[in-house]
Amino acid sequence: MAGFQMNLKKDKINKPNSQSKPKISFAFGGSKTNIIPKKSIASSQKNETRKLNPNALLGSESESEGEDAVVAIDSFDKKKGGAIAGNKAVNTKVTEPLIIKPTTASRDWKEEIRKKQNSMYIPNQEHRQKVIAKDDNNLEFGLSVPEKSNSKESVVDAESNDTMSKEERIRSSLLKGEELDDKGLIIPIPSEDEIVEQDISSKPDEDSIEQYKEVPVDQFGAALLRGMGWKQNKGKNIESAGKPLLERRKKGVLLGIGAKAVEDELMADLLVKRGAKFDIPVVRRNKDLNATK
């Protein structure tokens, strides 16, 4: 900065008879203390870059994140992670793409309960069915033979069951196709209120306002598409998993959305090509009888 400077100087040798008069000198210009040579600035910047913590290039320095660090970037390579300082990448943190999975539509839980209840097996359900009584007074024609009682066989089975072990009884009952004894197990069927409570408890918590603010607005659409199965580096015309490619429907002339293509002859008549004529049959009609001939 420009300024004004005044210095007062005295003689070093004091003569006895002469009066000492101070010498006054004036100087115009900037102060010498504020002037810094250019070489010192360049050397100080080099020293700062040399004294830089090597861990700062990897983003793992112990200092606070708010302080700025001087990093000399030599090149830029997208495959290696962006900016490169020397042989190392400046930012080695790999950020995964944001994915937002859409929630399912509101389900009709009452209908689901009815389907589950109808599909459940209810024991001894055959006993609840209506029994059609047989009429014993019906007359039967032909020779009637009375059925023999199996009392002897039942006595033999009871005696054999007493001598058999539990494993043998179970094995014989399975071979004969008999049903095992009911142990009285009860499977509780949840009510509608309990199912609603289970459905509410299984759903995730609502997102807070802070979580909404963390999602960038410009990345919301791509994140929602990724949640629905979209892949960024995959084009439309690339065939995958043996699925056929989508073909565009050829839309004919004078056709709207959802209309089908017409035949070639009718299309030629609509376009009024050369030699195309509309044939209208002439019918003779009797006015009195209002009948055709």
Swiss-Prot record:
Query: Known InterPro entries for this protein?
Result: Spp2-like, Spp2/MOS2_G-patch
Q: Which UniProt keywords apply?
A: mRNA processing, mRNA splicing, Nucleus, Spliceosome
Quick one: where is this thing mainly located? nucleus
Name the source organism: Debaryomyces hansenii (strain ATCC 36239 / CBS 767 / BCRC 21394 / JCM 1990 / NBRC 0083 / IGC 2968) (Yeast)
User: Where is the region Disordered?
Assistant: 1-65, 142-168
Q: Spell out the protein name for this chain.
A: Pre-mRNA-splicing factor SPP2
Q: Which family does it belong to?
A: Belongs to the SPP2 family.
Gene Ontology CC entries for this record: spliceosomal complex
Question: In which compartments does the protein localize?
Answer: Nucleus
The role this protein plays is: Involved in spliceosome maturation and the first step of pre-mRNA splicing.
Q: Is Nucleus among the key words of this record?
A: yes
User: Where on the tree of life does the source sit, at the highest rank?
Assistant: Eukaryota
Quaternary data: Associated with the spliceosome.
- What biological processes does GO assign it? mRNA splicing, via spliceosome
Q: Does the keyword Glycoprotein feature in the UniProt annotation?
A: no
Q: Which residues form a coiled coil?
A: none
